[in-house]
């Protein structure tokens, strides 16, 4: 006897069918659905509603190469005119492709398989939580994230903890942060002072909130904002350089991300209350500390006001905070670092580049970019944003969760053809993988702060 499927179950089935043949119209998708699920009772009106809700309607104006399951809004980015790529590598250059794809990196010479294309230190690093906890427990470097040899004579403690300055009444505990060398201690001055619980105790509740909610995008925005605030104390030129880097990153606001990437019948609205709570703590940490002792310490760190445009870009709720969160989530490397040149790399399900953390004894946060295969002059360098072991439909599903639309790399085009040619009864593998993505999607939403 036919029964009415649950909304989530029906949505997954329709996404899978559209992934197999994106050009199918509503009537054909509906007919295919009923053929594949003969015990379901679903009206064409309900099918249409779900397809429209998820942006899966074929537009009559679409080109043959376009796919119907691409979101109507894509991340935007801009090219940095003053970026000196040669400080990292003489093998690549930045190229702007088009408004939809944005910028990327192309080879300026032939690159052999296994070649090191460049090494890069992070602009900021908001490490994955396991390493962050090690930093808080004084067992990993507070700058480069390398695990500490606790008996090493090279270890340096936070200056605020080793000085004779009186502790604030709001905190009698020393800063737990340690550094593996004097070099890391010196470099940490770009970010650490304003996140130090002794020097700026107002930052502690914000960092705790990010940790408790395991919100990596917020954690990265915290470090980025700290860097901008501190670099402003050194002059307008250094501020402009760093601010230009931040503004050039690919971005998609939190509201847009949720509307076009995460929205579902099960979670029709984002948890805006959490966003507002985070924003309140963000302002208290970086602009308006709550108590007079906190305000006094904060004033010692930041004596120069920000230019109006930078202040707006950091502290306006929509144009600053929410868009900043979107930038972080789109550009973070897997382990929590934000890297200037690395952020230019686009996605392919058949990437020609891999990113490794090879300096694990003395610079864990440094990345090394290696050629997975030979790359010809003029060819774009790509990495994968998703697990390449997933099937076609599951990879497309995950990319949509990031707001990137459909991948049209050579591998995806070939696998889509194979899926379309396969008998309908033999195509359940990817559908299962798409279903398996629900747990990952939930984890992703939590990390980006939309749950």
Where are these regions (language model features)?
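Short alpha-helical interaction motifs and adjacent low-complexity tails used for partner binding
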Residues: 1-451
